[in-house]
Regions:
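Substrate-recognition/cap helix-loop segment adjacent to the acidic, metal-dependent catalytic center
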Residues: 44-51, 56-82
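Charged, amphipathic alpha-helical linkers/stalks
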Residues: 142-153
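Catalytic cores of eukaryotic secretory-pathway lumenal/extracellular enzymes that build
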Residues: 80, 84-87, 115
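Short, acidic loop-to-helix structural element flanking the phosphoryl-transfer center
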Residues: 2-52
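A short acidic, often aromatic-flanked loop/helix-cap motif at beta-alpha or helix-coil junctions
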Residues: 39, 84-88, 136-138
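Conserved Lys-Pro-Asp/Glu-containing loop-to-beta segment of HAD-superfamily phosphomonoesterases
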Residues: 89-115
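Acidic, Mg2+-coordinating phosphoryl-transfer loop and its flanking beta/alpha structural elements
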Residues: 108-110, 115-143
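A generic "structured core" feature
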Residues: 11, 27-34, 61, 70, ...
């Protein structure tokens, strides 16, 4: 992936070494969000087709492996921005989904980014459900400035 070429240049860590280290860490530390896991299990019970869309630089096979290891099981299709050379952020990935999955279908997109997952999904005819991510949800509980603590250490 192109990102590892930049990281190699900036850090001196070889592309393959960096990629393998990241994938190992992803495999070790990624786990299923219990609420999203419950939702995917419920959707599967209804027999609905479920696809993954992601603005991510990892390969589809890596994302597939991470999700399966985390307990989500297999999805029906994967649309990963770096493989389609377009993104949810710009809206083009939603167009690819419609082209491949069928323009006449109804889609519900669940995501944690208001711009990419909600606004762009709606612009492209998808129903959209916002799932607040942990960083946004935790923001009110984080101090604005922790620099005073640095003087204690």
């Amino acid at each position: 992936a192109e990102i590892y070429a930049v990281l190699e240049r900036e850090t001196g860590i070889g592309r393959q070494e960096g990629m393998q280290a990241e994938l190992a860490a992803e495999g070790r530390y990624c786990f299923a969000n219990p609420y999203m896991l419950q939702m995917t299990e419920a959707v599967r019970k209804y027999g609905k087709r479920m696809i993954v869309t992601s603005d991510m630089y990892l390969r589809e096979e890596d994302i597939r492996r991470i999700l399966e290891k985390a307990g989500y099981g297999k999805f029906d299709a994967y649309y990963i921005s770096n493989e389609y050379r377009c993104s949810k952020h710009e809206g083009k990935l939603y167009e690819r989904v419609r082209e491949k999955e069928g323009a006449g279908r109804r889609y519900v997109h669940v995501g944690d980014n208001l711009g990419s997952d909600v606004e762009q999904a709606k612009k492209h005819g998808f129903a959209a459900v916002y799932y607040e991510n942990v960083n946004t949800a935790g923001m009110p509980f984080r101090p604005e400035d922790m620099s005073a603590i640095a003087w204690i250490v």
